[in-house]
Design a protein with these regions (language model features):
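Short, well-ordered beta-to-alpha junction loops that form the rim of enzyme active sites
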Residues: 39, 55-56, 104, 145-150, ...
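C-terminal capping/extension of enzyme domains
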Residues: 1-31, 111-129, 156-228
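Short amphipathic alpha-helical segments
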Residues: 64-65, 155-157
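Internal catalytic-core helix/loop-beta-alpha segment
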Residues: 96-149
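Short, active-site-adjacent cap segments at secondary-structure transitions
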Residues: 59-60, 108, 150-153
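Conserved catalytic-core helix/loop/strand module for nucleotide-ribose chemistry
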Residues: 80-114, 189-192
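Adenosine ribonucleotide-centric catalytic and binding domains
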Residues: 27-98, 162-169
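Short, conserved loop/helix-junction motifs that constitute active-site signature segments
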Residues: 92-94, 135-138, 184-188
Length: 228
C-alpha cells in the first residue's frame, strides 16, 4: 500500500503542474497548500475491505487549511472520526488495517464549491479520471460515500438523493427496503452506499435513527455479494 500512496503523490504533483498551466482551472484552486493524499494504514492493497470517499477538503478559514494533512482528517480525533467509527464497528472493519479513504477533489478551492457549483463542473473530468485510475488497484472493493453533493457527481443513473437509498417514506421514517447504487449506475463501476456527511447526520433525525440499520444492510449485502 505504501508504494501505491507514493505513486499517488507523484500523480498529484503531475496534476498540480498541469492545472497550473491551465489558464481557467488554476483560478479555482488554492495552490498555497499541498494536495491531500489518500489515507490507508493497510499493509497490502488486497487487505482493504472498504473505500471511503469524500468530496473535497473544504475549509472556509484559509489559515486552518495548513492543519489538514490527511483525507477526512483521519489522523485526528474529532467528530467526523467518531462518526466513521460507528461505520467501522458495525461493519467489523479495522480502521488501522482494512480501509482506504480518499476525496474526489484532493485540492483546496479558493471558494467552497457550495458557494459556486460551476467550480465542480469545470474541475470534474480531470479529478474523476484521476480517481478512477487511483481506485483501479483496489479490486472488487465497495464504496461508502459521504454527503449528497458527492453522489450527484459519481452517479449517472438512478437517484442522487441519499434518503432514497435509505428508503425514506416521509416523516423521518424508513421502510427499511435499503439499496445501493449498482456498478453500472456510476462512474466508478462499483457498489456505492451513500451515507450522510457527519454534520447532516448530526442534525437530522431520519439519518440518526436509521444509520445503524443501513450499515447492517451494507454488511449483509456485501456478504451475499462475496458468496455470489
Amino acid at each position: 500500500m505504501r508504494k501505491h500512496v507514493l505513486q499517488m503523490e507523484k500523480q498529484l504533483k503531475a496534476t498540480k503542474k498541469m492545472l497550473l498551466k491551465d489558464c481557467v482551472l488554476k483560478n479555482d484552486i488554492d495552490f498555497n497548500y499541498d494536495f491531500i493524499l489518500p489515507f490507508s494504514n493497510a499493509e497490502r492493497i488486497k487487505d482493504v475491505k472498504l473505500i471511503f470517499i469524500g468530496q473535497d477538503p473544504t475549509v472556509r478559514n484559509r489559515k486552518s487549511r495548513e492543519k489538514i494533512k490527511t483525507t477526512l482528517n483521519l489522523d485526528k480525533e474529532n467528530s467526523l472520526k467518531k462518526y466513521l467509527k460507528t461505520v467501522y464497528d458495525i461493519m467489523q472493519v479495522d480502521i488501522e488495517k482494512e480501509i482506504y479513504a480518499t476525496n474526489l477533489y484532493k485540492c483546496f478551492f479558493n471558494k467552497p464549491p457550495a458557494d459556486d457549483q460551476t467550480i465542480l463542473t469545470r474541475q470534474f473530468k480531470i479529478w474523476m479520471d484521476l480517481l478512477i485510475n487511483e481506485l483501479s488497484v483496489l479490486k472488487n472493493t465497495f464504496v461508502v460515500t459521504l454527503g449528497e453533493p458527492l453522489i450527484n457527481q459519481l452517479i449517472h443513473t438512478n437517484s442522487k438523493k441519499v434518503k432514497d437509498y435509505w428508503d425514506y417514506t416521509g416523516k423521518t421514517k424508513s421502510g427499511k427496503n435499503f439499496k445501493c447504487n449498482e456498478p453500472y449506475e456510476n462512474y466508478l463501476q462499483r457498489r456505492i452506499y451513500p451515507i450522510a456527511h457527519q454534520p447532516t447526520w448530526n442534525r437530522n433525525k431520519f439519518y440518526k435513527t436509521y444509520l445503524n440499520d443501513y450499515l447492517e444492510y451494507i454488511k449483509q449485502n456485501e456478504r451475499k455479494s462475496s458468496k455470489a
